[in-house]
């Protein structure tokens, strides 16, 4: 079932790529979805599928570009607010990623090192005749949506996502610590996104996972 969904999505996106109006820059595709929806696995399968089309692919994972802990924890705001509004430098990702992808053949981006809690800056080259896949949560927030040519939303039931993340994210501590973190921070941030942005309505393609 998953393979067929990936194949169909690749065909749809390749059609968007071949028929794009501006061929002087990459086609920017967002792979959106809430925590545990399967975004990372899906984008890996999708990039493999694009090899059948002999198409150049660039990939960015939003979680590679979060800010340091002191900018998103114990800030005085509620935890859900820190997650939604402070986890990423919203304007910085426009300046350093989304706008440059529309104008030039490289981006200079901050990469986050989780173990060291440090940021390092790297240049990433991008071919103008390519598809760029950007994977992450909250991609359709009002500040970013304009820059994407096409957005796919992976829609996965809460129960499935909940079980995945609570058994996956051992770095948060034991099971009760994970449940507390998701209840107070991540799921409330996701609820805010679903209610204010309505990504299911804004997406170009919805895939049920």
How should each PLM-predicted stretch be described?
Residues 39:
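Conserved lysine of the Walker
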Residues 36:
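Walker A (P-loop) phosphate-binding loop of P-loop NTPases
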Residues 70-116:
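Conserved nucleotide-sensing/catalytic segment adjacent to the nucleotide-binding pocket
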Residues 53-70:
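Short beta-strand-centered segment that lines the nucleotide-binding/catalytic pocket of NTP-utilizing
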Residues 1-29:
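Extreme N-terminal, non-catalytic leader segments
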Residues 42:
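Hydrophobic positions on the alpha1 helix immediately C-terminal to the Walker A/P-loop
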Residues 141, 171-209:
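Small-molecule kinase domains that catalyze NTP-dependent phosphoryl transfer to phosphate-bearing small molecules
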Residues 118-169:
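ATP-dependent NMP and nucleoside kinases share a basic, alpha-helical "lid"
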